């Protein structure tokens, strides 16, 4: 896969412009894998020097755990901490291999452990339900992985912990997209999506550290609509226009 990166100076100017024109108090470094950006360290140092004293939060989502940088994490921990976002995508190693995620449970737990040791206590985990070949074991694996991550937090010496552990598990639903390896895969129905979310939710409630784990899932109705828009042909344009004429404007879909 060819690497394309934003120019460092352009990112600096964009940060200035966004804070000046929006009034926001957070800068989020977002990409498919923020930690792979070759100038991430220099960019983070710049943001801290320029905006840290002003209480601007620096958020680091989209971190690929196997490329997680403890050095970068330690640089931003003294500013207003936000949660760290990891995307295991699937609860089992088998399914991660199917979707070519390339992460092992050991690497995931090690990355989370580094985050906890670096002063974080809030972690967001993103998964996807309804992926090809998914079994109930894979669904329950999401809860088991969240539990193992929470256990990793409590392995950190008490004096080094930063309050109560907070793990937010979020699941979206799989939508087969054109020109992707799974473009012809079957998509779940609304009822199937909700059943899978129920399995995860029920299993989380069975875990020892369930109070440390919060679970959110995507709207099944919106996912089904997304699937129609993704797989539909030009005829779908008529439905979109009809929805607009009936008052749909800036709707989530």
Language-model segments: which ranges?
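Auxiliary Fe-S-binding modules of radical SAM enzymes
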Residues: 20, 139-253
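Short, conserved loop/turn and helix-capping segments at secondary-structure boundaries
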Residues: 5, 102-105, 187-194
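Canonical Radical SAM [4Fe-4S] cluster-binding loop centered on the CxxxCxxC motif
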Residues: 1-9
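Short helix/loop capping segments that flank catalytic or ligand/cofactor-binding pockets
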Residues: 1, 38, 94-95, 179-180, ...
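Phosphate-binding active sites in nucleotide-utilizing proteins
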Residues: 8-16
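Conserved SAM/AdoMet-binding glycine-rich loop
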Residues: 16-168
